Swiss-Prot record:
This is Flagellar assembly factor FliW 2. It is found in: Cytoplasm. GO terms for biological process: bacterial-type flagellum assembly; regulation of translation. HAMAP family: FliW (MF_01185). Its main location: cytoplasm. Gene3D superfamilies: BH3618-like. The keyword Cytoplasm applies. One of its GO terms (cellular component) is cytoplasm. Belongs to the FliW family. It comes from the Bacteria.
Length: 139
């Protein structure tokens, strides 16, 4: 699905992105306009941990979220893929929020570290995976 970015992603000038779901855990976004083409791999943070945050009011307004309409957002975090995959790192502090109801999206960049200390550092994927899954990945 194509989304309009309500704020540019830091370092990029694209205003339109495509969200492509790979599976229940991984997705990617691709810049559709702008001078620099890009692709960013995303991960569903809810598949990793007990993930919750409050969308800042300014971001809610930009996304035109309306609970009375039943707007439901989709949330993804940036994952930087490494080999082996369990060494990939996840940034939980700057999630992407997508509003499918109006095809708008943005990256939240203003979560206060004091309120979300558990998200304040980039963590390797292996921190979230069970021993069984890690063994499967290493076969």
């Amino acid at each position: 699905m194509t989304y309009e970015l309500k704020m540019p992603i830091l370092g990029f000038d694209a205003t339109k992105i495509e969200l492509e779901k790979i599976d229940e855990t991984f997705s990617k976004i691709r810049g559709l306009d702008g001078k620099q083409p890009f692709e960013i791999t995303l991960i569903n943070p809810f598949s990793l941990c007990d993930y919750a945050f409050t969308i800042p009011t300014a971001d809610e307004r930009l996304l035109d979220l309306d609970e009375s309409r039943g707007d439901k957002v989709e949330v993804y975090c940036v994952v930087v893929l490494q080999k082996p995959i369990e060494n990939s790192v996840v940034n939980l502090m700057a999630p992407f929020v997508f509003n499918p109801a109006n095809a708008c999206a943005l990256q939240v960049t203003t979560l206060p570290v004091a309120e979300y200390p558990q998200f304040s550092k980039v963590l390797p994927l292996k921190e979230f995976l069970s021993k069984e899954i890690l063994e499967t990945l290493n076969r």
